């Protein structure tokens, strides 16, 4: 005979196997809590959130029960985890059009900025808070150079799943020399670049993301404001050659993702809606820019 008893209550939530990731970073992603009624759906959802963090092997996340007390109607929920290396090092190089192209990039996906001055936490860098820190540089010498830096905090303030993203970007590009374009250009690579033709690009973006519970709790919303500034000097490849051009934009991204595994998806769906807008500058300044010169219209 099978006799149905009272619904079980969760006694403890136990986490095992986290060697680098701090325990509070893991617990804040869970949907099961001590004292709540047992829910298989919440345990599956918790395992899915842990898999999507990217710090653990999704195929080895094993939620299980322990210390089951039938008389008291309680049980412990145990999440056994296996940490995996998710940081990235990018090194690339090539040769083409008479130039060497090289790039280097570093991405740390489990960074801890609060421990940056705590030397005991370096393994080899401060880790465990689930933050993402990225650096990248690319150059081919005199013609083109770029640098970018980005940082993402998935839980701003540590209490709610509101993310903060900040990125910076800079690039420097020169134009092609007129000597390079003549019929002897194959032997004139030393005169390929013209430092008198120059474009500098500066970029900054700040974004805030949050999880939303309507129409269901699979949705996220991300809002970003970005600014780019272009400084041109004798630049023949744009609508004007000298001056500055600025671009301010606001973007909103609404995403629904219910996939069970980011790498080997077996179930779920994902879709994204995005919208990017620029402010109506003519309304703010009460000017009709269609009659202005390009240097004024696009500055």
Regions found by a protein language model. Name each.
Residues 34-37, 90-94, 294-298:
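Short, contiguous acidic/charged loop-to-helix segments that flank catalytic cores in large enzymes
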Residues 5, 18-21, 111, 171-173, ...:
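Short connector loops/turns at beta-strand edges and beta->alpha or beta->beta junctions
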Residues 15, 26, 42, 48, ...:
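Acidic, glycine-rich loop-and-beta core segments that form the ion-binding/anion-interacting portion
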Residues 34, 139, 193, 279-283:
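A generic structural motif
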Residues 1, 7-62, 153:
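Structural signature for solvent-exposed beta-strand/loop edge elements and short helix-capping sites
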Residues 9, 84-88, 282:
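Short, cysteine-centered beta-strand-loop-beta hairpins and adjacent loop/turn segments enriched
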Residues 39-264, 269-270:
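Gram-negative/organellar outer-membrane beta-barrel architecture
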């Amino acid at each position: 005979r099978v006799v149905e008893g009272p619904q079980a209550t969760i006694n403890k939530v136990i986490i095992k196997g986290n060697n680098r990731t701090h325990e509070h970073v893991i617990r804040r992603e869970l949907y099961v809590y001590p004292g709540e009624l047992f829910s298989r759906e919440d345990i599956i959802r918790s395992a899915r959130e842990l898999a999507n963090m990217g710090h653990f092997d999704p195929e080895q996340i094993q939620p299980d029960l322990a210390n089951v007390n039938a008389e008291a109607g309680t049980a412990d929920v145990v999440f056994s985890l296996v940490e995996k290396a998710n940081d990235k090092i990018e090194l690339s190089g090539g040769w083409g059009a008479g130039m060497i192209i090289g790039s280097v990039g570093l991405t740390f996906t489990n960074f801890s900025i609060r421990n940056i001055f705590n030397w005991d936490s370096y393994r080899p860098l401060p880790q465990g808070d689930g933050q993402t820190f990225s650096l990248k540089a690319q150059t081919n010498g005199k013609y083109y150079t770029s640098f970018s830096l980005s940082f993402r905090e998935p839980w701003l303030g540590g209490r709610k799943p509101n993310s903060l993203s900040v990125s910076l970007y800079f690039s420097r590009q020169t134009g092609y020399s007129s000597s390079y374009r003549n019929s002897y250009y194959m032997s004139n690579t030393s005169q390929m670049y013209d430092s008198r033709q120059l474009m500098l690009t500066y970029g900054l973006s700040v974004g805030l993301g949050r999880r939303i519970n309507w129409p269901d709790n699979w949705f996220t919303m991300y809002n970003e404001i970005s600014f780019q500034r272009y400084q041109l000097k004798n630049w023949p490849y744009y609508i004007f050659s000298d001056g500055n051009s600025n671009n301010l934009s606001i973007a909103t991204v609404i995403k629904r993702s219910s996939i069970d595994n980011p790498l080997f998806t077996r179930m779920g769906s994902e879709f994204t809606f995005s919208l990017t807008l620029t402010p109506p500058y003519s309304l703010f300044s009460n000017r009709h820019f269609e009659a202005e010169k390009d240097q004024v219209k696009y500055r």
